[in-house]
C-alpha cells in the first residue's frame, strides 16, 4: 500500500463539478493499493499517517501529529501510484490491485482513520475527480506499508 500525503490548509474533491469531500487544516492522502495488500497494511498505514509528526509546534518545528492539531483527512483513491513508467511511454498499471480489492481496502482505510478519531472525507472510488488543495509548507511525503 502506498500513499502520497500532503499537509494542507484546505482540500476539496469534486465529481462532475459537484463537491463530494472537503476539509480544512489537515492531510490530503492519495491512496494506492497493491494486489498483495491486506488488512495488515491498512492498519499499519492508517496509524502511521495519523501519527506522523508533520505539523508545526509553537516553535515552528514539525513536532505535532494530525490528531494533536485537530486536523482532518481527505482520502482519495489513486491507482496510478502503482504506475510503472520504465518501459515505453505509456505507464503500466499491472502493479495496482484489481478494483474489487482496492475498493475494499480503501474503504477499510477510511474506517480505520475514522475509528482513530479523525474527521474523514473521501473522494468517489473509481470516478474521474477534480482535486484541489492548498499545500502548506509545502510538505509532501510518500508513505509505504512495505
From Swiss-Prot:
Cited InterPro entries: Daa-tRNA_deacyls_DTD, DTD-like_sf
Protein name (database record): D-aminoacyl-tRNA deacylase
HAMAP family attached to this UniProt entry: Deacylase_Dtd (MF_00518)
Quaternary assembly: Homodimer.
Stored SUPFAM superfamilies: DTD-like
Role played: An aminoacyl-tRNA editing enzyme that deacylates mischarged D-aminoacyl-tRNAs. Also deacylates mischarged glycyl-tRNA(Ala), protecting cells against glycine mischarging by AlaRS. Acts via tRNA-based rather than protein-based catalysis; rejects L-amino acids rather than detecting D-amino acids in the active site. By recycling D-aminoacyl-tRNA to D-amino acids and free tRNA molecules, this enzyme counteracts the toxicity associated with the formation of D-aminoacyl-tRNA entities in vivo and helps enforce protein L-homochirality.
Keyword tags: Cytoplasm, Hydrolase, RNA-binding, tRNA-binding
CDD domains per the UniProt record, alphabetical: Dtyr_deacylase
UniProt remark on domains: A Gly-cisPro motif from one monomer fits into the active site of the other monomer to allow specific chiral rejection of L-amino acids.
Enzyme Commission numbers on file: 3.1.1.96
GO terms, biological process: D-amino acid catabolic process
Broad class of the protein's primary localization: cytoplasm
Residue ranges of the motif Gly-cisPro motif, important for rejection of L-amino acids: 137-138
Catalyzed chemical reaction(s): glycyl-tRNA(Ala) + H2O = tRNA(Ala) + glycine + H(+); a D-aminoacyl-tRNA + H2O = a tRNA + a D-alpha-amino acid + H(+)
Gene Ontology CC: cytoplasm
Organism expressing this protein natively: Desulfatibacillum aliphaticivorans
Domain of life: Bacteria
Compartment(s) where it occurs, according to its Swiss-Prot or TrEMBL record: Cytoplasm
Molecular function via GO: D-tyrosyl-tRNA(Tyr) deacylase activity; Gly-tRNA(Ala) deacylase activity; Ser(Gly)-tRNA(Ala) hydrolase activity; tRNA binding
Amino acid at each position: 500500500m502506498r500513499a502520497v500525503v500532503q499537509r494542507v490548509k484546505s482540500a476539496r474533491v469534486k465529481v462532475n463539478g459537484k463537491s463530494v469531500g472537503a476539509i480544512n487544516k489537515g492531510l490530503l492522502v492519495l491512496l494506492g493499493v497493491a494486489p498483495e495488500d491486506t488488512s495488515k497494511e491498512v492498519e499499519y498505514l492508517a496509524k502511521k499517517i495519523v501519527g506522523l509528526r508533520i505539523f508545526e509546534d509553537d516553535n515552528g518545528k514539525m513536532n505535532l501529529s494530525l490528531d494533536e492539531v485537530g486536523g482532518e483527512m481527505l482520502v482519495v483513491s489513486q491507482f496510478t501510484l502503482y504506475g510503472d513508467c520504465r518501459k515505453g511511454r505509456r505507464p503500466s498499471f499491472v502493479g495496482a490491485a484489481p478494483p474489487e480489492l482496492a475498493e475494499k481496502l480503501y474503504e477499510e482505510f477510511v474506517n480505520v482513520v475514522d475509528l482513530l478519531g479523525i474527521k474523514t472525507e473521501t473522494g468517489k472510488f473509481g470516478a474521474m475527480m477534480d482535486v484541489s488543495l492548498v499545500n502548506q509548507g509545502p510538505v509532501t511525503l510518500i508513505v509505504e506499508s512495505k
